[in-house]
Every structure is written in structure tokens, then in C-alpha cells.
Regions:
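C-terminal secondary-structure termini that scaffold catalytic or DNA-interacting sites
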Residues: 282-295
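Catalytic-site neighborhood detector that most strongly recognizes the C-terminal catalytic loop/helix
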Residues: 157, 256-281
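Basic, Lys/Arg- and aromatic-enriched nucleic-acid-binding interface segment
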Residues: 107-135
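Short, polar N-cap/turn motifs at the start of nucleic acid-interacting alpha helices
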Residues: 145-148, 217, 247-267, 291-294
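Long, amphipathic, Lys/Arg-enriched alpha-helical "connector/arm" segment
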Residues: 90-117
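C-terminal catalytic core of Y-nucleophile DNA break-rejoin enzymes
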Residues: 160-177, 190-213
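Short, basic (Lys/Arg/His-rich) helix/loop patches that form interaction surfaces
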Residues: 112-115, 210-254
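N-terminal core-binding DNA-recognition domain of tyrosine recombinases/integrases
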Residues: 1-94, 111-112
Length: 295
């Protein structure tokens, strides 16, 4: 009944929705409801007033998702119950993103052949910087994912199961080629990135953040306590750069492997170029000098 496969949801999201739906129907039974037609507005309100699930999270997102997917089973009743569930907006923290200066410094570190980066580290950093791939997908890349002749990079995302096929930029292809021809161990493994020591197992996603931190140290960026250094910074950067260059949202979504266009909202919040176009000038309004005085 639950159409999670069509949404590309993580298994954890599916489990949460099912758990919260089960809790909801059990609570309805405790209130005397024997079938879906018996569920009243007052019963739903009473349930929601209990606050949170056992894991401390709001019940609304998972429950709403379940009810929405069940509508085809009983359109009238499930739409009725779905309409009784209020929309819950969750406040999100401001997302750190790479500034133009930080991006230039990171790029310079990647291109500086005199620093201590290995060819593998350089290839990993280049992939992240120019494609916005997740760390798990970088670690899971296989040799067959790279089509140097036709300039294509293709893989299936681990998180969503979405197949991604994007152009392989020359700078990315060159970094991968250098690693494969001059540093990659001789191995029958289908995976692209391997460990340096025998038996040369594929790297794991846990190795990627360490590579990013090393490059940032060499670039001299994000050295303050609390500065974010995760690979998600690069997904944010790729989406923002594409938006600033007027790339259509569907193309950005396809590049990042996003099924839901709304997933771009948090990335595009840093598209300063287009945000400025929406701003209103206040030059027509007289402002006293005292307003700008700093005491």
C-alpha cells in the first residue's frame, strides 16, 4: 500500500512513516475507532496533542506522507484524514556555504602540483568540487562509471537509487586519468578508488571527509572552530553556481540526482545574484545619518 518506491525515499524515512502510521491507528483503536470511517476530527486532535513520537520527533511528517500515499486506496476517507493533519513547518538552521574566495582557494589547492596531495586525493577533491557528488557515491564509483572517450560520468546514487548521467568535465576526467595511470594499484577490483596497501580494498565514504579536510588545510580555509567542512558544501556550491548562470531547475535537479524540485530550495537560498534582482531599492527614501552611526 505504501508507495515509497516512487518517491525515492531512504529506508529510514519509510520505516519512520510506517511506524508513525501504526502508532496513529493504534491510538485510534484505543479511542474506540473500529474502521477508518470512525476516525473523527476530535480523535485526530487528541492524538496530535500528545506531542511527539517515542523518538522525540514530531509525528506530522511521516504520518502525512503515509496518508497521502494511501489516498488511492480510499480517496474520500484518506483525503479527509490527511486534511485534518496540520502543516508543520520545521525551522532550519542557516546553511554554511563556500564563498567565492574559499572556492578559489580550494580550486588552487587542487591545481597546485607542488603540495602534498596524492593523485587519488586530488581526483576525489576534483570530483566533489565540480560535480557535487555525495561522499558515498564517490567512494562507490566504479571504473565503468567513467567514460573518458565520450565524456560521460554515470552512476546510481546510493541514498536515493536515482540513476545520474552527467557530462564529465575535462578537469575531472584528467584528474581521474592521472590517478588511474600513475597511482592506482594494479587490481581486478571494479571500484575506482582503492586503498594504497594490499589487498587494496575499495575506500569507504568515511575516508572522504578526511581528504576534504586535508585540502582545506592546504587551502587555508575553514580553519575556525565550528566551521563546516562536510562534502555537502560542494553540492550547495554546484547548485548555486548553476543557478547563478541561469541553468534551469530541472537540469540542476538532474545533475544532483534530486527527484523533488523542492529539494533545491535550501541550496538556492545562497543564489545571491538572483536574490539581489528581487530586492527593492530604498534610495528614494531619506534616511538620517544617525541611523548609520555606530555607537
Amino acid at each position: 500500500m505504501f508507495c515509497s518506491g516512487k518517491r525515492g525515499l531512504k529506508e529510514s524515512s519509510v520505516r519512520r512513516a510506517k511506524f508513525e502510521a501504526t502508532s496513529f491507528f493504534l491510538a485510534m483503536q484505543d479511542q474506540g475507532c473500529q474502521c477508518i470511517e470512525d476516525i473523527s476530527e476530535s480523535a485526530v486532535i487528541h492524538y496530535l496533542r500528545t506531542g511527539t513520537s517515542n523518538n522525540g520527533r514530531t509525528k506530522l511528517p511521516g504520518l502525512s506522507l503515509f496518508m497521502r500515499d494511501c489516498i488511492p486506496q480510499n480517496p474520500y476517507e484518506y483525503r479527509r484524514i490527511y486534511g485534518l493533519i496540520p502543516i508543520k513547518y520545521v525551522a532550519r538552521k542557516t546553511i554554511q556555504f563556500l564563498t567565492v574566495e574559499e572556492s578559489i582557494a580550494f580550486q588552487t589547492a587542487l591545481e597546485d602540483l607542488s603540495n602534498t596531495l596524492s593523485l587519488k586525493q586530488r581526483a576525489i577533491g576534483t570530483l566533489l568540487f565540480y560535480t557535487g557528488m555525495r561522499s558515498c557515491d564517490v567512494a562507490n564509483l566504479q571504473l565503468e562509471s567513467i567514460d573518458l572517450q565520450n565524456g560521460i560520468l554515470q552512476f546510481t546514487q546510493i541514498k536515493t537509487g536515482v540513476a545520474v548521467r552527467i557530462p564529465l568535465l575535462p578537469v575531472v576526467g584528467n584528474a581521474i586519468y592521472d590517478y588511474c595511470t600513475m597511482e592506482r594499484p594494479s587490481s581486478d577490483s571494479p571500484f575506482l578508488f582503492l586503498g594504497e596497501f594490499a589487498p587494496h580494498h575499495p575506500i569507504t565514504s568515511k575516508a572522504i571527509p578526511w581528504v576534504v579536510s586535508k585540502i582545506m588545510d592546504l587551502a587555508g580555509i575553514r580553519t575556525n572552530k565550528g566551521d563546516r567542512r562536510g562534502t555537502h558544501l560542494f553540492r550547495h556550491r554546484v547548485a548555486t553556481v548553476m543557478a547563478e548562470n541561469n541553468v534551469p531547475a530541472p537540469v540542476i535537479s538532474a545533475t544532483l540526482g534530486q527527484k523533488n524540485p523542492k529539494s533545491l530550495d535550501s541550496y538556492l537560498s545562497a543564489d545571491i545574484t538572483h536574490l539581489r534582482e528581487c530586492s527593492l531599492s530604498i534610495k528614494e527614501y531619506a534616511i538620517r545619518e544617525e541611523v548609520f552611526d555606530i555607537v
